[in-house]
């Protein structure tokens, strides 16, 4: 491994920036992290373009941390910017980047891809699907609960990151001219308003400039860092880990608590994994090791050198690192970089919401595709404006990036701990690692995560409660929806009958047949849906052709066309159809009918009637049924409200509304 690392470093130092010379470096990078150099993204020019795109999406959050991270290390703990403290904190920052990002995420977590996709819900689905222990159902339930809580915490992070990033960028105006101070908050709100208004138009057109802008940003970070380090080369002592250890030992509790601010340098780590499906592992690793990491280390060390020479610069070392003539351009570039970072996070929250809907943890909501080419380009109005309200509230309440830093970090540390736990399960169950190997590697990561989490706990009374409360609310909603749907499914199944029994009854007592085709949607592919039984009971008539359609979501991101549709003709002109989708896909009725047509089952859309059940949930007071794990009455009422306000299947599955019949069903839970 070390020989490959040396080859990689030598290739970087001796290669000129052309594709032919860089390709061996890419191959060495794959070898260091144990990746097969498969045909995926083999072309070097494609890898470079994807790496550039990854800069604009994946590294926005972690790339804007220099705006506030080092400043916050000295802001709340009574630590003076003495040479010993500066070198010690820089050492902690450097080794946090190495251990948390380079080793944990780049070398191990990125391996845990779910058919190429990443993210905490994708990892949860992979961990659940991989369970092979004796007590499978219990362990699957545990992994699901842990994963849901991790996803819920990321919603809290998604609201704080835009607020703290843009505020910290705008605060640079006070160095340009102190009279700008009263306008910081109004300008931040203006930028946020424009950002969230822009979402409905999508980012397909302007997204192409995100990568180049972030490349300029990282280049400027590196140049500013070199400028600062040139004035005091003693900062290179921070590369030695014993300085960080001595800092922790010499400063006691204050030294431990400063880890809460040190963690701010890696708050964008989850994005590396979440966006793996968009860019692939190689481009993300390439962008990190060749661009983002060097630029970040140079800038943090440059800020440290500035503090060694001028401790008074601790009030804003990032902007004071720049020459005075460059302050205004730096504020403008910082604002663009933080807007791009915020955009990436908003898109990430949209993606998590879509996955949660498909996996059955969230009610159906209106999802608008903003690009005909990119499946990931979506806009969810209710999520967008909920985030907007939350961000504006944070800006008006906390007012400065330093105040917001007190609320930042604890939710992300919780999510990173959960990622470690889920990755451990994948290593044990899917990769077949021994308990000793899995525990040694991921146990070490968990100790690191717990240290950061413990250092952030003290933030709870000072604003850290905000992301935790947001996460708790989202977690409550997701688990209530999941549990409520399970109870509803059981109630509907009680009213159903096996499709084989139903067909035998049709053969014995043939009903009147109406011309045309009827497609009944059902949650259970093996039972007859209540609307069909209702129709037979009251109307005693059946369409000439009847299909019972069930849409199932698998624990994989995408389902191949070959496995999309399963069709069985139970008896002549009575079909059972199962449409399989991944959690990254959104089912559409026209696509399902087209897949049926390719199987020689032609449903003419204009002559087809779609029959759906419309459940009215009645929250029943009293004890649960014997042997059934139900919900508290207030959660049953909450589920009833969520069900009532969920988007109707007609709109969600894009079914022609003038061909839909909805049959009302009252269900007590």
Curated annotation (Swiss-Prot):
Transport of potassium into the cell. Likely operates as a K(+):H(+) symporter. It is a multi-pass membrane protein. This is Probable potassium transport system protein Kup. It catalyses: K(+)(in) + H(+)(in) = K(+)(out) + H(+)(out). The chain crosses the membrane at residues 47-67, 86-106, 144-164, 172-192, 206-226, 252-272, 288-308, 326-346, 378-398, 404-424, 435-455, 460-480. Keywords: Cell inner membrane, Cell membrane, Ion transport, Membrane, Potassium, Potassium transport, Symport, Transmembrane, Transmembrane helix, Transport. InterPro entries: K+_transporter, K_trans_C, K_trans_N, Kup. It is found in: Cell inner membrane. It holds the Pfam family K_trans_C. One of its GO terms (cellular component) is plasma membrane. Belongs to the HAK/KUP transporter (TC 2.A.72) family. One of its GO terms (molecular function) is potassium ion transmembrane transporter activity.
């Amino acid at each position: 491994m070390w020989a490959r690392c040396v080859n990689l470093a030598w290739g970087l130092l001796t290669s000129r920036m052309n594709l032919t010379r860089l390709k061996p470096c890419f191959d060495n990078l794959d070898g260091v992290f144990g990746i097969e150099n498969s045909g995926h993204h083999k072309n070097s020019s494609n890898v470079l373009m994807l790496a550039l795109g990854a800069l604009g999406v994946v590294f926005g959050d972690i790339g804007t941390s220099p705006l506030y991270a080092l400043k916050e290390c000295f802001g709340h703990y009574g630590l003076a910017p003495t040479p010993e403290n500066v070198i010690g904190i820089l050492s902690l920052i450097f080794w946090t980047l190495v251990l948390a990002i380079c080793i944990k995420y780049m070398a191990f977590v990125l391996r845990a891809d779910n058919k190429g996709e990443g993210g905490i819900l994708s990892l949860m689905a992979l961990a659940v699907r991989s369970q092979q222990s004796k007590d499978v159902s219990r362990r699957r339930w545990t992994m699901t609960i842990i994963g849901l809580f991790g996803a819920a915490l990321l919603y809290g992070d998604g609201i704080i990151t835009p607020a703290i990033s843009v505020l910290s960028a705008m605060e640079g105006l006070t160095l340009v001219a102190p009279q700008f101070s009263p306008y910081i908050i109004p300008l931040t709100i203006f930028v946020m308003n424009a950002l969230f208004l822009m979402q409905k138009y999508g980012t397909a057109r302007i997204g192409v400039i995100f990568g180049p802008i972030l490349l300029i940003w990282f280049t400027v970070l590196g140049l500013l860092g070199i400028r600062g380090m040139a004035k005091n080369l003693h900062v290179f002592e921070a590369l030695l880990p014993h300085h960080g250890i001595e800092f922790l030992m010499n400063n006691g509790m204050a030294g431990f608590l400063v880890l809460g601010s040190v963690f701010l340098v890696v708050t964008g780590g989850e994005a590396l994994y979440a966006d793996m499906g968009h860019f692939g592992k190689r481009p993300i690793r390439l962008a990190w090791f060749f661009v983002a990491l060097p630029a970040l280390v140079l800038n943090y060390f440059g800020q440290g050198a500035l503090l060694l020479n001028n401790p008074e610069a601790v009030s804003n070392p990032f902007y004071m690192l720049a020459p005075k003539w460059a302050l205004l351009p730096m504020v403008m570039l910082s604002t663009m970089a933080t807007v791009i970072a915020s955009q990436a996070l908003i898109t990430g929250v949209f993606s998590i919401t879509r996955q949660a809907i498909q996996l059955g943890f969230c009610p159906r909501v209106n999802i608008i595709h903003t690009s005909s080419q990119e499946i990931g380009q979506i806009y969810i109005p209710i999520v967008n404006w909920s985030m907007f309200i939350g961000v504006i509230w944070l800006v008006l309440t906390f007012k400065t990036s330093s105040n917001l830093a007190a609320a930042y970090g604890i939710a992300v540390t919780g999510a990173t701990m959960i990622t470690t736990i889920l990755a451990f399960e994948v290593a044990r169950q899917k990769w077949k690692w021994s308990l000793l190997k899995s525990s040694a590697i991921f146990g070490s990561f968990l100790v690191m995560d717990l240290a950061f989490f413990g250092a952030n706990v003290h933030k709870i009374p000072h604003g850290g409660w905000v992301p935790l409360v947001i996460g708790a609310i989202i977690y409550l909603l997701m688990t209530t929806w999941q549990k409520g749907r399970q109870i509803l499914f059981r109630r509907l199944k009680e009213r159903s009958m096996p499709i084989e029994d139903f067909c035998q009854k049709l053969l014995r007592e043939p009903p009147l047949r109406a011309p045309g085709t009827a497609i009944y949607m059902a949650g259970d592919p093996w039972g007859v849906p209540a609307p069909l039984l209702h129709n037979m009971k009251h109307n005693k008539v059946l369409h000439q052709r009847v299909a019972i359609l069930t849409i199932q979501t698998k624990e994989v991101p995408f389902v191949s066309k070959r496995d999309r549709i399963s069709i069985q003709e139970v008896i002549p002109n009575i079909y059972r159809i199962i449409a399989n989708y991944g959690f990254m896909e959104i089912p559409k009725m026209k696509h399902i009918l087209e897949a049926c047509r390719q199987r020689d089952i032609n449903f003419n859309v204009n002559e087809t009637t779609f029959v759906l059940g419309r459940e009215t949930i009645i929250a029943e007071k009293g004890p649960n049924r014997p042997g059934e794990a139900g919900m508290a009455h207030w959660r049953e009422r909450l589920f009833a409200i969520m069900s009532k306000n969920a988007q109707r299947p007609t709109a969600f599955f894009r079914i022609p509304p003038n061909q839909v019949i909805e049959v009302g069903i009252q269900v007590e839970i």
